[in-house]
């Protein structure tokens, strides 16, 4: 295959409604192109004025995805990494806030030589420079850029104008726009309606952009007649109208797009020839394992503070999909509201009936903390597999201090600055930090693992690198006491000072980690801790089933005489 001389650009936009899945579309297309032997990267442009999503509420933004180099980014970058098996970075997520900040800083430095600084040309030029810089500094064939928001949003206009100008600058065959729209199915009329898509394209034309390809989300498959109609009214060949109906799992999307020949249309429009056929055997096998698990199903409870909005735990949910497939089981998830467990009359046995493991999720602040601690206590005492991530690990050490080490006033200084026993305390280098945004311990750090621990059994190695996002750490003043009472500190920083992994020795599977393993789980590289946790939950479920079967068996066997008849007859 002849490599393109210049980096080719694909811009993905969305219309009609939000949350259509531009991130999944971008990731799926990137995976298909990579499987053909092309070098592909994906980036996300977000129109909000925040510099990054690090200080945004999970209820508004969902999960904050952390990269190896410490960027706090949009959750769509998680999809990019999981689908492409490629790491993203600081440059993979650009917000309008970062653009404006850069422009204002340049104005203060006198870089514009006294000019009146305006959206056109200064803001637009700043965006175009970022676009060109990402392509120039990468060893790429294709750069996919997802533009957040929906066509018609005021805040997206600078990104769209920059895309329009860049397409003119680069010339034909170097940049295409894929527009994702929605074709609603009206049940009363038993009909798919194309008018919203037509209006969305009209708005895109209004800012000077003719989409090159339309991808139409719908509940039902698009017929050839519908594609012809959409193409006719949107200035497109019907072959450039791609149908994308609902599917059982997001991991089927690449296979559906392959069937619709989206990748072939993209390569033709970009003038790329001689590419190989996509190798997707592993991907098909993975999808079959997700849809048709061979060893049944299990249920894992996720105890968290933001359970009303599952996107706050997006990477955890996807890691369970990967670990379920690697264990040949379906992992069902039940979201457990931490605050509910703080009620004195809360019935844990009833709430956790049918649950085979408990994960206590990350978070910030004191809301729901006592509920999390009670869930952890129940998991420890009932020998239920437990996994604590970041705040979940910190809560596990507080619970252990209170109920095993008899330190009844144990707490974290995040929740009680005057805690008598500060099991969790602010990291030393954080004590002088005043700003909130981008100031935590962020990114990938090494961790040394203890031989013979559950962590070592999972990883099968002594040195790992994991991603972090925290300000607080375990207080080493209590380390000796905890070890005497049965806790194993199985993972630490290389200097041994920062506790990364804790375990309870006499428990079937009780592990807490300071880092975020969910951020490194991928389709082709399930995270070892999630695989091990799901395996423990599967074993626990089998034990419960065997106990249930034993209970259902008769409690006595009749005594038979020599003729084989019951003596009681």
From Swiss-Prot:
Gene Ontology MF, one: glutaminase activity
Positions of L-glutamine binding: 59, 363, 391-394, 414, 471
Residues binding UTP, per UniProt: 18, 193-198, 229
EC numbers: 6.3.4.2
Organism superkingdom: Bacteria
Glutamine amidotransferase type-1 domain residues: 299-543
One GO-annotated biological process of the protein: 'de novo' CTP biosynthetic process
Keyword Transmembrane helix attributed: no
Binding-site positions, CTP: 18, 153-155, 193-198, 229
GO cellular component: cytosol
Gene3D superfamilies membership: 3.40.50.880, P-loop containing nucleotide triphosphate hydrolases
Regulation: Allosterically activated by GTP, when glutamine is the substrate; GTP has no effect on the reaction when ammonia is the substrate. The allosteric effector GTP functions by stabilizing the protein conformation that binds the tetrahedral intermediate(s) formed during glutamine hydrolysis. Inhibited by the product CTP, via allosteric rather than competitive inhibition.
Region (Amidoligase domain): 1-272
Function description: Catalyzes the ATP-dependent amination of UTP to CTP with either L-glutamine or ammonia as the source of nitrogen. Regulates intracellular CTP levels through interactions with the four ribonucleotide triphosphates.
Sequence similarity: Belongs to the CTP synthase family.
Assembly description: Homotetramer.
Protein's recorded name: CTP synthase
Source lineage: Bacteria, Pseudomonadati, Chlorobiota, Chlorobiia, Chlorobiales
Gene encoding the protein: pyrG
């Amino acid at each position: 295959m002849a490599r393109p001389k210049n980096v080719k650009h694909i811009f993905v936009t969305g219309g009609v409604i939000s949350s259509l899945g531009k991130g999944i579309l971008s990731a799926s297309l990137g995976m298909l192109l990579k499987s053909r032997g092309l070098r592909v990267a994906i980036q996300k442009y977000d129109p909000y004025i925040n510099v990054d999503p690090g200080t945004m509420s999970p209820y508004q933004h969902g999960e904050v995805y952390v990269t190896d180099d410490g960027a706090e980014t949009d959750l769509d970058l998680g999809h990019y990494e999981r689908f492409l098996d490629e790491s993203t970075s600081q440059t993979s997520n650009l917000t309008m806030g970062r653009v404006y900040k850069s422009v204002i800083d340049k104005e203060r430095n006198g870089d514009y030589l006294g000019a009146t600084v305006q959206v056109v040309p200064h803001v637009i030029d700043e965006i175009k420079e970022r676009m060109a810089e990402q392509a120039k500094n990468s060893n790429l064939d294709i750069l996919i850029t997802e533009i957040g928001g929906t066509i018609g949003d005021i805040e997206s206009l600078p990104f769209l104008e920059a895309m329009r100008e860049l397409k003119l600058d680069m010339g034909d065959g170097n940049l295409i726009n894929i527009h994702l729209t929605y074709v609603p199915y009206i049940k009363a009329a038993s009909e798919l309606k194309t008018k919203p898509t037509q209006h969305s394209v009209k708005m895109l034309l209004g800012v000077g952009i003719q989409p090159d390809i339309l991808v139409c989300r719908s509940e039902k498959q698009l017929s050839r007649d519908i594609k012809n109609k959409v193409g006719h009214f949107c200035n497109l060949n019907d072959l450039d109208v791609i149908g994308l109906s609902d599917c059982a799992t997001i991991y089927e999307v690449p296979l559906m797009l392959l069937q619709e020949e989206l990748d072939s249309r993209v390569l033709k429009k970009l003038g790329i020839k001689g590419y190989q056929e996509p190798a997707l055997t592993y991907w098909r096998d993975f999808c079959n394992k997700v849809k048709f698990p061979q060893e049944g199903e299990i249920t894992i409870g996720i105890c968290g503070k933001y359970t009303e909005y599952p996107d706050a735990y997006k990477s955890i949910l996807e890691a369970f999909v990967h670990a379920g497939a690697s264990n040949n089981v379906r992992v069902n998830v039940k979201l457990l509201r931490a605050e509910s467990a703080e009620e004195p009359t809360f019935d844990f046995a009833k709430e956790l009936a049918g649950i085979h493991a408990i994960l206590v999720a990350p978070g910030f602040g004191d809301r729901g903390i006592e509920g999390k601690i009670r869930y952890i206590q129940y998991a420890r005492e009932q020998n239920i597999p437990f996994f604590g991530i970041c705040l979940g690990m910190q809560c596990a050490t507080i619970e252990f201090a209170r109920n095993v080490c008899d330190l009844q006033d144990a707490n974290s200084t995040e929740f009680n600055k005057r805690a008598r026993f500060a099991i969790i305390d602010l990291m030393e280098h954080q004590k002088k930090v005043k700003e909130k945004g981008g100031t935590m311990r962020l990114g990938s750090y090494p961790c040394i693992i203890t031989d013979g621990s559950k962590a070592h059994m999972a990883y099968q190695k002594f040195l790992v690198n994991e991603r972090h996002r925290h300000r607080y750490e375990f207080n080493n003043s209590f380390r000796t006491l905890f070890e005497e009472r049965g806790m194993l500190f199985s993972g630490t920083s290389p200097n041994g000072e920062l506790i990364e992994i804790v375990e309870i020795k006499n428990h079937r599977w009780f592990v807490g980690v300071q880092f975020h393993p969910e951020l490194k789980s991928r389709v082709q590289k399930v995270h070892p801790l999630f695989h091990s946790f799901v395996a423990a939950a599967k074993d626990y479920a089998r034990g419960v089933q065997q106990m249930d079967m034993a209970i259902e068996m008769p409690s006595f066997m009749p005594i038979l005489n020599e003729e084989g008849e019951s003596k009681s007859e």
